[in-house]
C-alpha cells in the first residue's frame, strides 16, 4: 500500500504472483504426512514486479510512454497474470471465479479437496503434543480452531464458481474482451465438493480428541476466535459442526448467488439451476442416513440449519420473486418428504417448524445457533477501499 499498490486477489491463480493477494500457507501431503516446506514464499511475485515496472519505470526522452506502459501490461497478461481487487473479491456473494482472499491454486475445487485431506490428517494427529509442558489442556480448544476450520477461506473461493461470472477490468485495445459464465460442469463439480464437505463424517471432531478439550482454565478466557458454545463452559461437541455446516450453507444459498443461477439457467438450459442445487443439498441433509449416534446428532443440527438458511433466503426482502418461488417449492418438498418419512426422529418438530414459518414468513424468528469464530481480521471501514467485511 505504501508504494501505491492495491490488492490483487486474483494473483494466486498463477502461482504466488503477488504478496498483495493474502496467500494462504501452502500445505503439502508427503507420504501421508503434512509438509510445511513450501508454506511461505520468499520475495516478490510476478504481478508485484509488473506493478513496480508499470508505476516506477523511467523511459528515455522521446519514448512513447503510453505504448511502453501498455506493453508491460500486455506482457503480464500473456504470462497469465490477472488483476481483480477488493470490491469483487471480498463479498461472500461475489461472482468472480478467481478473486478470493486466503486461497491457493489455479483450481479452487482441487485446492478445496486437497485442504480437506490436509485437515483430516491434522485432526487425526491433533493431541496434547500441540501443548508446551505446563500449558493447560484447555488451550487446545483455541489451537484446534484453525485446524478444524482450515478450509473455510477456500470454501469462499470454491463457492464463487457456483453462479460464477468471469470478467476483467478490461479497456478497449488489442486484448480481446468478453464476459463468460463459469462452465456448467465446473459449477456442478464445485457444488459436489461443497456438499461432500457437509457430511457428518467430515464435520465430526474425532471422538478421542473430545476427551482432551476441557472448559477454559483459571486465568484464561475465551475470545472472539474461540469455538462458540450452547453447553455452558463445557466444549460444545455439536456446536462446532453446526457452525461450520451453517456457514457453508449460507455461502451456497447466498441470495445474490442463487439469483445469478436462475438467470444463467434462463440463458443456458445446460447450466446448474437453483432447483438442482437445492435438491442436492436436500438429498445430502435430509435423506442421508447414519447408524452412528454421533453422526445422527450432527445430521440433526444440519437439518435445523438448512431449514433456517432456507427460511432466511425466502423471507429476505432483497431476493427476487423467482428466488422466493423456488425456495418456497424447496421448503414444501421437504415438508412433503417429512410427512412420508415416519422414521425421521424429529419429524413432528420439523413439520411444525415449516408450518409456522409458511404461515407468516416475515414474522418468523430463526432459532440462534453457534456462529463461526471470527477469522480474517484484516480490513476496516477506513482501509482497503472502504469495504466492510
Question: Where on the chain are the PLM-derived regions?
Answer:
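Active-site recognition of the HExxH zinc-binding catalytic motif
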Residues: 1-7
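Short, flexible loop/turn elements at secondary-structure junctions
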Residues: 7-9, 24
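Conserved catalytic/binding loops enriched for acidic/polar residues
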Residues: 14-389
Amino acid at each position: 500500500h505504501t508504494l501505491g499498490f492495491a490488492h490483487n486477489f486474483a494473483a494466486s491463480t498463477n502461482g504466488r504472483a503477488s504478496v498483495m493477494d493474502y496467500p494462504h500457507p501452502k500445505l503439502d501431503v508427503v507420504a501421508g504426512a503434512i509438509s510445511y516446506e513450501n508454506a511461505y514464499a520468499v520475495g516478490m511475485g510476478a504481478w508485484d514486479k509488473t506493478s513496480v515496472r508499470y508505476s516506477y519505470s523511467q523511459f528515455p526522452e522521446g519514448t512513447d510512454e503510453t505504448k511502453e506502459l501498455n506493453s508491460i501490461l500486455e506482457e503480464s497478461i500473456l504470462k497469465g497474470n490477472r488483476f481483480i481487487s477488493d470490491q469483487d473479491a471480498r463479498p461472500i456473494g461475489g461472482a468472480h471465479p478467481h478473486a478470493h482472499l486466503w486461497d491457493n491454486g489455479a483450481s479452487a475445487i482441487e485446492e478445496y479437496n486437497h485442504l480437506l485431506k490436509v485437515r483430516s490428517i491434522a485432526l487425526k494427529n491433533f493431541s496434547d503434543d500441540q501443548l508446551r509442558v505446563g500449558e493447560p489442556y484447555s488451550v487446545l480448544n483455541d489451537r484446534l480452531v484453525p485446524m478444524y476450520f482450515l478450509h473455510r477461506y477456500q470454501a469462499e473461493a470454491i463457492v464463487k464458481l457456483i453462479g460464477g461470472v468471469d470478467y476483467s477490468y478490461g479497456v478497449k485495445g488489442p486484448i480481446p474482451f468478453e464476459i463468460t459464465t463459469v462452465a456448467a460442469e465446473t459449477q456442478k463439480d464445485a457444488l459436489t465438493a461443497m456438499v461432500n464437505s457437509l457430511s457428518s463424517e467430515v464435520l465430526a471432531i474425532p471422538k478421542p480428541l473430545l476427551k482432551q478439550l476441557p472448559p477454559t482454565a483459571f486465568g484464561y478466557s475465551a475470545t472472539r476466535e474461540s469455538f462458540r458454545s450452547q453447553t455452558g463452559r463445557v466444549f460444545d461437541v455439536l456446536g462446532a459442526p453446526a457452525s461450520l455446516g451453517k456457514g457453508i450453507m449460507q455461502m451456497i444459498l447466498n441470495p445474490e448467488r442463487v439469483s445469478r443461477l436462475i438467470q444463467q439457467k434462463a440463458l443456458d438450459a445446460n447450466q446448474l439451476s437453483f432447483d438442482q442445487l437445492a435438491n442436492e443439498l436436500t438429498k445430502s441433509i435430509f435423506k442421508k442416513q447414519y447408524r452412528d449416534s454421533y453422526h445422527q446428532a450432527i445430521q440433526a443440527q444440519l437439518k435445523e440449519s438448512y431449514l433456517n438458511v432456507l427460511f432466511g433466503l425466502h423471507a429476505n426482502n432483497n431476493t427476487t420473486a423467482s428466488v422466493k418461488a423456488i425456495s418456497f417449492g424447496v421448503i414444501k418438498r421437504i415438508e412433503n418428504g417429512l410427512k412420508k418419512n415416519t422414521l425421521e426422529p424429529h419429524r413432528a418438530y420439523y413439520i411444525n417448524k415449516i408450518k409456522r414459518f409458511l404461515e407468516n414468513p416475515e414474522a418468523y424468528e430463526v432459532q440462534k445457533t453457534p456462529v463461526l469464530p471470527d477469522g480474517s481480521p484484516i480490513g476496516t471501514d477506513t482501509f482497503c477501499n472502504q469495504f466492510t467485511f
